[in-house]
């Protein structure tokens, strides 16, 4: 049994749908609120959370008449209370308040809090048996088996909100799980798609941030340039759809129009296409199992003219190879992969290491973790958070050696 409903299970929702948005002030939250804004007659907002942007959070709470609002930073509670003083909106601060927001009664929850901080709130929504649109990578990369098992046990539905996984979700509805032979996740190739390995090694921060298609945050844009982001998506797809690494392929597609493909036993391949706009997969999750009016630009294939595809290069982009290695290793290795990458990207942004050293730090951390005998199954959110914390410490310890080798 899967928590991801590959077929319409009769879950159509009549009347007004109650919504909670965890991470309402981030980029995914912004796209979600834009869609809610377009159809106020269909949705009622229960809870909203934000990290530290109190002004933005309070503005959204008032606009959508939220029942409860939580800010992750405990020090901002007074500021939030003051901003909402002329309303009857309840508010809180800190991790417990964010978890409370996730636990409140809502038909549909957008889990878009970034980082490991999003794991416990997403689990709180899952444990309530909610329909959860999942945009937090750590829930799957750091605790995939555990998270999906909890969702099944609670009767929760997990709807993939990431563009590639949502594409697979839509394409999988064309057949049955036992008929699937492989899924294909597409990658733009990033700004260094045609660069030589030596040039990629020396790439600057400004060059890494020039994504050809998507407008994203700094960290994810760098991950796209290194293809670490695609590695994370391979890991996520494995847990979401119960796929082995051998059932997941990556295909470089520079135009970012085809987002995912599914091949079935009869060798039919079903693909999902759309403009590179996160409002498309979010709208699919928001309306599921129905469809709602979109806010993104309509796709004009004649204007685009051609779609091209290439095999990924695991030599120039070793981060993708390392993701498959971590997935096959299991026992927390994918958590280590993600944690080490976050340390490496932060070091690159701070100009402590070269771009090419990002993958080397991830590989050295993974190897060090295995040699230390740290591999073990994760059976709780605290287990996953502990591995994440300790892997970051190991990566930080290895960082000076990596930096010295590159100098």
UniProtKB/Swiss-Prot annotation:
What's its EC? Answer: 1.1.1.267
Q: What is this protein called?
A: 1-deoxy-D-xylulose 5-phosphate reductoisomerase
Which HAMAP family does the UniProt entry name for this protein? DXP_reductoisom (MF_00183)
* Gene Ontology molecular function: any one: 1-deoxy-D-xylulose-5-phosphate reductoisomerase activity
| Organism expressing this protein natively | Rhodopseudomonas palustris (strain BisB5)
What is the enzyme's class at the highest EC level? oxidoreductase
Q: Which family does it belong to?
A: Belongs to the DXR family.
State the PANTHER family in the record.
1-DEOXY-D-XYLULOSE 5-PHOSPHATE REDUCTOISOMERASE, 1-DEOXY-D-XYLULOSE 5-PHOSPHATE REDUCTOISOMERASE, CHLOROPLASTIC
Chain positions recorded as NADPH binding sites: 25-28, 53, 136, 138, 217
Q: What is the lineage of its organism?
A: Bacteria, Pseudomonadati, Pseudomonadota, Alphaproteobacteria, Hyphomicrobiales
